[in-house]
Amino acid sequence: MNGDHMVLGSSVTDQKAIILVIILLLLCLVAIAGNGFITAALGVEWVLRGTLLPCDKLLVSLRASRFCLQWVVMGKTIYVLLYPTAFPYNPVLQFLAFQWDFLNAATLWFSSWLSVFYCVKIATFTHPVFLWLKHKLSEWVPWMFFSSVGLSSFTTILFFIGNHSIYQNYLRNHLQPWNVTGNSIWSYCEKFYLFPVKMITWTMPTAVFFICMILLITSLGRHMEKALLTTSGFREPSVQAHVKALLALLSLAMLFISYFLSLVLSAAGIFPPLDFKFWVGESVIYLCAGVHPIILLFSNRRLRAVLERCRSSRCRTP
């Protein structure tokens, strides 16, 4: 559920909307299962070996934050269905929005730093700065982690200040929950404070992510062209590996675009609250969140091997 931009006051009675709500909850369960599996697999490896690869530390941080985010989304969705006329900035929804804002920002930053790591480590650019980064980047992973937590905490506090100001104004003026949209303080805070802050804080990690994705896809594309010149065609294992990597990167980039655009449209109030279009937007957001770990499971050799071991152990269990 997108942060705090929701004005309640009408129940979900549209049959299509109810179906979308059910789909949204199922997508959350899929995302919880996928992210939970990846977090558990990498967490067990971390405990057994006492260490993880730098990129896996970022990956497990990303998956853990997404895992928690899906639970918050489910909790907020259920609360909205049970109390459709509740004031959108009441303490319960502020508490859920606080968690959602932090976890959403954390997933965006962890995704951006992970794309930086993969870009620097995998891309084959020969610029001196790029080569220098290859040797230094692994040492910066702790800084990436703490910067993600710090930036997410800072932006969450900014969101909380805006949400709490609206709630205090509501208490002072004895407004009705359904009339909050007509209040000038609410309108001013949403348009000139919350929305700009969201755009800035969401766009920064998204821009980093896409710059790195473009560089990485460009590098892999050039490498694949060279491989095609020295091999007999697409059936060669090396070429197929490049094709699979490119397809995985493109699919992840498309999912990230869909996620980001849906967040922006929802924050801008394009989707009417609790209407069919609103739930369409929410479903798109969490469809991306649900598909992403599945792609990762089948594109990562180590995670795929863990999944196969789990399947084989279940088959042997009487």
From Swiss-Prot:
It is found in: Membrane. Residues 1-7, 62-88, 150-183, 256-264 are extracellular. It comes from Macaca mulatta. It holds the Pfam family TAS2R. Signal peptide: none annotated. It is a multi-pass membrane protein. The gene is TAS2R60. The keyword Transmembrane helix applies. This is Taste receptor type 2 member 60. Residues 29-40, 110-128, 205-234, 286-318 are cytoplasmic. Receptor that may play a role in the perception of bitterness and is gustducin-linked. May play a role in sensing the chemical composition of the gastrointestinal content. The activity of this receptor may stimulate alpha gustducin, mediate PLC-beta-2 activation and lead to the gating of TRPM5.
